[in-house]
Every structure is written in C-alpha cells, then in structure tokens.
C-alpha cells in the first residue's frame, strides 16, 4: 500500500488546525499509519530540507520549521502521494484553490500550514527521517 509523509507545520499547530486537517484526510479514506507531535531539531530540519541548502530562503525555512511543535504523520492509501498534494493545494496561498488546505488556511508562502511528500521516493526518504520502522503501524 502506498504511503506518504505529511507534516502540519508550526503555524498550523499554533492556530489549532490539526483536528480539521486530520479529519479531511480521514474523510478521504486514508489510514494514519503513524503520527506524533514533536519539535524538529536544527539537524533534522537541515536534513529534511537539504535540497534547498544553497537557496537564499534556507535559513528562514529552517528557523520557521524549528520555531514550534509540528505534527508529523504517515498516511496510507491508494494514490495517497498525489491525492494529498492535491488536497494541500498550491505552495503559495494566493495560488491555492478554495477547498484545499492551503487555500482555506495558509496565510503566506512562509506560513503555508502543511508539507507533503512530492513523490513516492521523497515519501520513503522523509518517512525514514522522521519515523523508526517500529513506529509505523
């Protein structure tokens, strides 16, 4: 069964959006295979966003993602990677359609509420970064 990594970012946790976001995924029929509330360390943030290391926004991205607790999860279901991306909406809130998570809740490109794996390969890498095998149910 296909799995993807999803993270509700500090702005989503701070604004009390965790329950609503989880409910949307459950209503779609996705199974939660793992879930935890956590603070991301500087090292984990840098590893997670390694592809952006040379970009000018990298320090701000790491600073933001380590600024408060996040909810990390693994969702499972047919076509889950692509479907979660669709449910999240465009990265920039101004481009995100109403009815998508970012369209409904994101305020800026920096505080866009949620992260989801872009590909199956990214999902496998990100799941391994955030969860030990025994944490996956």
Swiss-Prot record:
Provide the protein's localization. Answer: Cytoplasm
The record's listing under PANTHER family reads: NUCLEOSIDE DIPHOSPHATE KINASE (PTHR11349)
**Per the record's keyword annotation, is Aminoacyl-tRNA synthetase included, yes or no?**
no
Taxonomically, the superkingdom here is Bacteria
Job of this protein = Major role in the synthesis of nucleoside triphosphates other than ATP. The ATP gamma phosphate is transferred to the NDP beta phosphate via a ping-pong mechanism, using a phosphorylated active-site intermediate.
Q: Which reaction does it catalyse?
A: a 2'-deoxyribonucleoside 5'-diphosphate + ATP = a 2'-deoxyribonucleoside 5'-triphosphate + ADP; a ribonucleoside 5'-diphosphate + ATP = a ribonucleoside 5'-triphosphate + ADP
Q: Which cofactor does it need?
A: Mg(2+)
What is its quaternary makeup?
Homotetramer.
Show the active-site residues: 115 (pros-phosphohistidine intermediate)
User: What GO annotations for molecular function exist for this entry?
Assistant: ATP binding; metal ion binding; nucleoside diphosphate kinase activity
What name does the UniProt record give this protein? Nucleoside diphosphate kinase
Where does this protein hold ATP? 9, 57, 85, 91, 102, 112
